[in-house]
């Protein structure tokens, strides 16, 4: 994603039906989150529409005018200190990791995979780190709404490459 951002650029985008941004296509919400209305069933696989390369009707900028580009993209080494240095210098990083069944049931605390089969992969944003009762962790923003985990965030054990999270870290310069 970072490389695409640097080479191809991305438009402003935004939440479903948000105004004042370029949305070449929309994905409606699904399921139920907190006190929001029920939006219909969520499906495991949603077909990605072909990008129209146009903004929605009524938006004042052309697609090409709305594009923003990153300056560079890079992969970080599988090294806690290198990841921490990059976050301190450039801000959050993106990490891919292997998802197991127990992750879907996370509510709070420091997540460490203990049970269940692999269900796929996922990308998240590592925004910081800390320690709780001597256990080091990454502080991570997830994309599964604020009714998941710790208000949309979670903590994952740091320093043992849990679910391979420390070997699949990417970042870029905006």
Curated annotation (Swiss-Prot):
Enzyme class: hydrolase
Domain of life: Eukaryota
Pfam families referenced in this protein's UniProt entry, alphabetically: Peptidase_C1
Molecular function, one GO term: cysteine-type peptidase activity
Keyword Calcium found: no
Disulphide bridges: 22-55, 30-42
Keyword Hydrolase among UniProt keywords: yes
E.C. number(s) listed in UniProt: 3.4.22.-
Active-site annotation: 122, 142
UniProt-recorded name of the protein: Cathepsin B-like cysteine proteinase 3
Source organism of this protein record: Ostertagia ostertagi (Brown stomach worm)
Organism lineage string: Eukaryota, Metazoa, Ecdysozoa, Nematoda, Chromadorea
